[in-house]
Regions:
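Core segments of transmembrane alpha-helices
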Residues: 16-22, 79-86, 130-137, 196-210, ...
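Hydrophobic, aromatic-enriched interface-forming segments
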Residues: 127-180
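Transmembrane helix-loop-helix
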Residues: 34-38, 72-111, 198-239
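Helix-coil boundary and interhelical linker segments in multi-pass alpha-helical membrane proteins
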Residues: 23-40, 86-101, 136-158, 207-221, ...
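N-terminal topogenic module of multi-pass integral membrane proteins
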Residues: 1-91, 255
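Transmembrane alpha-helical segments that form the membrane-embedded catalytic/substrate-channel core
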Residues: 44-55, 110-115, 161-177, 227-238
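Interhelical loop and helix-boundary elements at the membrane-water interface
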Residues: 1-15, 64-73, 112-132, 181-197, ...
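Solvent-exposed interhelical
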Residues: 56-74, 162-205
C-alpha cells in the first residue's frame, strides 16, 4: 500500500508572510481574543491547501492527465480546506462575517497568481500578488480581535503588504545576482539588477511617509520600514553572484520580527 505523504508548501518564508501580520493584527488591539486561535488554525488549513490547489489549477489549465498526482492533490486539498472550514464555522456563527470578504480577497489572489504563473513564472509581479493575499491575515485578525473593520484594519493591511513586498523584491534581487554566476559584479551589473529593488523600496518608504503626513498612520511606521530599506540599499551595493540563501532567510525573518515589534508599539 502506497504511503501518502502530506503535501506542504516548500516556500517556508510564506509562513512568516501569513503569521507575522497576524501577530501584529492581534497585538495592536492590546486585548487577547480566543477567536484569534481559531482564526490562526483556520488560516493554517487554507494556507496548506495552496500547493495541492495550485497543482489542480495547473492541471485544469494545462490539461494535465497525471491521475496519481491529481488524485493525491484532491485528497490533501480536501483535508486542508476541510480543516480550515471546521475552524472557520464557529467564528461565522459568532458573527465574525467580515472575515469572509477578506478571505475572498486571499482566494482571489491565489487564483490570479496560479493563472499568471503559467506565463510569468518566477517574476516579481506574481509573488507580489501572493503577498497581497497572504497579508490579509493582518486586517482579518484585527477584525476578529476588535470587532471593527476601520482605518486601522486597512492601514495594517497596507503596511504589511508593502513591507513583505520589500522582502519579495529583495529576494528576487539576490536570485538574479546568484544567476549571474559572477563572483564579483561591476557597478553596471549592480545597477541593472538592482534598479527594481531600489525603486520599490524608495516608493514604499515614500508612500509610508505620505501616510504619516496625512495622519493615516503613526510616525513610527517610518522607523519600521527604515531597517529593511537600508538593508536593501546595502544588499544592492554589495551584490555578488555568491548568495547564501539560508542566511538570507534568517536575516529576513529577523527583519520581519523587528518590523512587527515596532508596528505593535506604534500606537494605532
Amino acid at each position: 500500500m502506497r504511503r501518502l505523504n502530506p503535501i506542504i508548501p516548500k516556500e517556508h518564508g510564506a509562513l512568516a508572510v501569513v503569521f507575522v501580520p497576524m501577530v501584529i493584527g492581534a497585538s495592536v488591539t492590546q486585548s487577547f481574543s480566543p477567536w484569534v486561535i481559531l482564526l490562526a488554525a483556520s488560516t493554517l488549513g487554507f494556507f496548506l491547501s495552496y500547493v495541492p490547489m495550485q497543482t489542480l489549477v495547473r492541471g485544469l489549465l494545462d490539461g494535465s492527465r497525471d491521475a496519481a498526482i491529481i488524485r493525491e492533490s484532491k485528497l490533501w486539498a480536501g483535508i486542508y480546506i476541510g480543516a480550515g472550514t471546521i475552524f472557520l464555522v464557529p467564528m461565522l456563527l459568532n458573527g465574525h462575517w467580515m472575515i469572509v470578504p477578506l478571505g475572498a480577497v486571499g482566494a482571489a489572489s491565489f487564483m490570479l497568481r496560479a493563472s499568471l504563473e503559467r506565463w510569468f513564472h518566477g517574476r516579481v509581479l506574481v509573488d507580489l500578488i501572493a503577498v497581497v493575499g497572504l497579508t490579509v491575515s493582518a486586517p482579518a485578525t484585527y477584525v476578529v480581535s476588535s470587532g471593527l473593520f476601520d482605518q486601522t484594519a486597512a492601514t495594517l493591511w497596507i503596511l504589511n503588504a508593502l513591507f513583505f513586498g520589500c522582502t519579495v523584491v529583495y529576494v528576487h534581487l539576490k536570485i538574479r545576482g546568484s544567476a549571474s554566476k559572477k563572483r564579483r559584479l561591476g557597478w553596471s551589473d549592480k545597477i541593472r539588477l538592482g534598479t527594481l529593488n531600489l525603486l520599490y523600496h524608495l516608493l514604499a518608504l515614500s508612500f509610508v511617509i505620505f501616510l504619516v503626513a496625512v495622519h493615516y498612520t503613526p510616525r513610527i511606521a517610518i522607523i519600521a520600514f527604515a531597517p529593511m530599506t537600508m538593508h536593501a540599499i546595502y544588499g544592492t551595493v554589495s551584490l555578488s553572484g555568491q548568495v547564501r540563501f539560508k542566511r538570507l532567510g534568517f536575516i529576513l525573518v529577523g527583519q520581519s520580527v523587528l518590523f512587527a515589534v515596532l508596528l505593535i508599539h506604534a500606537g494605532f
